[in-house]
Regions:
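Metalloprotease/metallohydrolase-associated module, dominated by Zn2+-dependent proteases
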Residues: 1-5, 9, 161, 179-244
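Active-site-proximal gating segments in proteases and membrane effectors
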Residues: 98-124, 188-197, 222, 233-299
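Transmembrane alpha-helices and immediately adjacent membrane-cytoplasm interface residues
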Residues: 43-69, 93, 97, 205-219
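N-terminal low-structure segments adjacent to metalloprotease catalytic domains
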Residues: 1-57
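Catalytic Zn2+-binding segment of zinc metalloproteases
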Residues: 150-169, 243
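Active-site His/Glu-centered metal-binding helix of metallohydrolases
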Residues: 13, 146, 150-154, 167, ...
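Active-site metal-coordination segments of metallo-dependent hydrolases
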Residues: 75-89, 216-238, 275-282
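Peri-catalytic and regulatory segments of divalent metal-dependent proteins
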Residues: 60-159, 258-261, 278
C-alpha cells in the first residue's frame, strides 16, 4: 500500500513538474504559456504521458509473474517434488522470515546459471532459479544467491525500478514534444503558436524521443547497478557474512550466466562477465570488492 501511495504521489509530482518546466521554457523563449505554443493538445499530451509512461510501466509490473513464468518456462514448486526442491523452498522461507516479508512463490526454470525475482508487491513476489545454477553451486553459495534475490524483494526494487522507468518515460514523451514544437515553430512571429509545420514537428519528435530515450535508458541502467550492490549487501546481512556471496559471485565468474528476457535482466543475479554503461549489473569484480569493503564490523 505504501508503494502504491508513493506511485500516485510521484505521478502527480511528475505531471506538475513537467507543467512547470514546459511553461518556464515557453515563457523564456516566447513570453507566453505552453498552451499558446502547443495548443489545446497540451492537456491530451499530459494524459498520454501519464497513461503510456506511468500506468503502462506499472501494468507491466502487475503481470510480471505470469510473464516471467511463460518467458522462461519456470515451474512453481512447493517442496514435495524432491530433496533439492524441498531444501530450496525451506531456504527461501527462512530468508523471507529474516527479511520480514511473506514467502514468495519459488520456481525453477531450465537454462544456464542465473536467478531472478519479480512481482508487483514484496509480499506476493516470485523467486526463480535455473536448473544449471542449482547444479553448479554449493548450498551455501545458492543460499547467498537466494539472499540476493530476497533482498531485491524486501527492498521493493521491482516497484522502484518500474517507478523510475515510468517517470523517465513520461519526461521523454512530454519534453521531446515540447522541444519539437518550440523548434518547429521558432520564428513564426506569432508568440510561438504552432502553425503548419507538421512534417518538421513529427521528425523532430522522433529524433528527440530517440535521443532522450537513450539518455533515460542510461539512467535506468545506472540505477539498476546501484540496486545490485544493495542486494549483494542485503544477502551478506541475511547470511551474517559476505563470504558466501563472494564465493557465489566467483563461481558465476567461472560460468557463463544465463541470458534473461529484457524485462527480467535487472532482477537477475548476474548479466555477464563484462560490464558497461548499458549493463544492469556491475562487474563481478566490482561487486566482490564492494562486499570485501563491507567489513565484518558493519555486519
Amino acid at each position: 500500500m505504501k508503494r502504491i501511495f508513493l506511485f500516485l504521489v510521484t505521478n502527480i509530482a511528475v505531471l506538475l513538474t513537467l507543467g512547470i518546466v514546459a511553461n518556464l521554457l515557453c515563457a523564456f523563449l516566447y513570453g507566453t504559456s505552453v498552451e499558446q505554443v502547443i495548443g489545446p493538445e497540451w492537456t491530451v499530451l499530459l494524459v498520454y504521458a501519464f497513461v503510456y509512461g506511468m500506468l503502462g510501466a506499472f501494468i507491466s509490473l502487475l503481470f510480471s509473474k505470469p510473464i516471467a513464468k511463460m518467458s522462461c518456462g519456470a515451474k512453481t514448486i512447493d517442496g514435495t517434488e524432491g530433496e533439492a526442491e524441498r531444501w530450496l523452498v525451506a531456504t527461501v522461507e527462512d530468508l523471507a522470515r529474516q527479511a520480514g516479508v511473506k514467502t514468495p512463490e519459488v520456481a525453477i526454470y531450465p537454462g544456464a546459471a542465473n536467478a531472478f525475482a519479480t512481482g508487483a508487491f514484496k509480499n506476493s513476489a516470485l523467486v526463480a532459479v535455473s536448473t544449471d545454477i542449482m547444479g553448479q553451486m554449493t548450498k551455501e553459495e545458492l543460499r547467498a544467491v537466494l539472499g540476493h534475490e530476497m533482498s531485491h524483494v524486501a527492498n521493493g526494487d521491482m516497484v522502484t525500478l518500474t517507478l523510475v522507468q515510468g517517470v523517465l518515460n513520461a519526461f521523454v514523451i512530454v519534453i521531446s514534444r515540447v522541444l519539437a514544437s518550440v523548434l518547429a515553430n521558432a520564428g513564426n512571429g506569432e508568440g510561438g503558436r504552432r502553425r503548419n509545420n507538421g512534417g518538421l514537428y513529427f521528425l523532430l519528435v522522433m529524433v528527440l524521443q530517440l535521443a532522450l530515450g537513450i539518455l533515460a535508458s542510461l539512467i535506468v541502467m545506472w540505477f539498476s547497478r546501484k540496486r545490485e550492490y544493495a542486494a549483494d549487501a542485503g544477502s551478506a546481512k541475511l547470511l551474517g557474512t559476505p563470504s558466501a556471496m563472494i564465493a557465489a559471485l566467483r563461481r558465476l565468474g567461472n560460468l557463463q550466466p544465463g541470458v534473461l528476457p529484457d524485462s527480467l535482466r535487472a532482477m537477475g543475479i548476474a548479466e555477464g562477465k563484462k560490464t558497461s554503461i548499458w549493463s544492469t549489473h556491475p562487474s563481478i569484480e566490482d561487486r566482490i570488492e564492494a562486499l570485501q569493503n563491507l567489513g565484518a564490523g558493519i555486519m
